[in-house]
Design a protein with these regions (language model features):
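Short acidic active-site motifs
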Residues: 55-59
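Short acidic/histidine-rich motifs immediately flanking catalytic phosphotransfer sites
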Residues: 63-75
Length: 113
């Protein structure tokens, strides 16, 4: 069974972008932890990062289809900067029926204060 881990815009900069806010853990470190945890649970994981909203939507659509076919459990998604602005991502998640857990590295609403 598969799980998608989806990272939004600028998360490729983890580890060196504002380390006082986001820490020094890199995106590669996060993906390695996800892969190791998935393996322990007997799951497959695909980690994908994009700075482009359309690419994120395409992944959600693809995994929505896999979920309907019984091949994917769902997704863990950090939409990054798109958290407060993307109606299209919301519609993609809602429209596909893909179970999605939204996660964040900081308290949303406070990161840009």
């Amino acid at each position: 069974m598969m799980i998608l881990v989806l990272h939004g815009p600028n998360l490729n900069l983890l580890g060196w972008r504002e380390p006082e806010v986001y820490g020094t853990t890199t995106l590669e470190d996060v993906n390695a932890l996800c892969a190791a945890t998935a393996a322990e649970l007997g799951l497959q994981v695909e980690c994908h990062q994009s700075n482009h909203e359309g690419h994120l939507i395409d992944k959600i659509h693809a995994y929505g289809r896999l979920h309907r076919e019984g091949q994917a459990l769902g997704a863990v998604f950090n939409p990054g900067a798109l958290t407060h602005t993307s109606i299209a991502l919301h519609d993609a998640i809602k429209g596909t029926g893909l179970p999605v857990v939204e996660v964040h590295l900081t308290k949303i609403g406070r990161a840009h204060v």
